[in-house]
Amino acid sequence: MGAGTAPKGKRNRTPTHIRCRRCGRRAFNVKKGYCAACGFGRSRRMRKYSWSHKWKKKRNLSY
């Protein structure tokens, strides 16, 4: 089977991302087994970067 349009049509059967157990966002990748938002499944620590400020607003932190 090729890698073109026909195989891409099979991607609509199962969801790529489901709700994460840790952060609650719909960012847990089923195939890869980790959350794109908080890093659950890949790391014990929360995924956070200085260039990302949404998590600061969500948690009401001031640093």
UniProtKB/Swiss-Prot annotation:
GO terms for biological process: translation. Zn(2+) binds at C20, C23, C35, C38. Keywords: Metal-binding, Ribonucleoprotein, Ribosomal protein, RNA-binding, rRNA-binding, Zinc, Zinc-finger. A zinc finger (C4-type) spans 20-38. Its cofactor is Zn(2+). Binds 1 zinc ion per subunit. One of its GO terms (cellular component) is cytosolic large ribosomal subunit. It comes from the Archaea. Belongs to the eukaryotic ribosomal protein eL37 family. Binds to the 23S rRNA. This is Large ribosomal subunit protein eL37. It comes from Thermococcus gammatolerans (strain DSM 15229 / JCM 11827 / EJ3). The lineage of its organism: Archaea, Methanobacteriati, Methanobacteriota, Thermococci, Thermococcales. The gene is rpl37e.
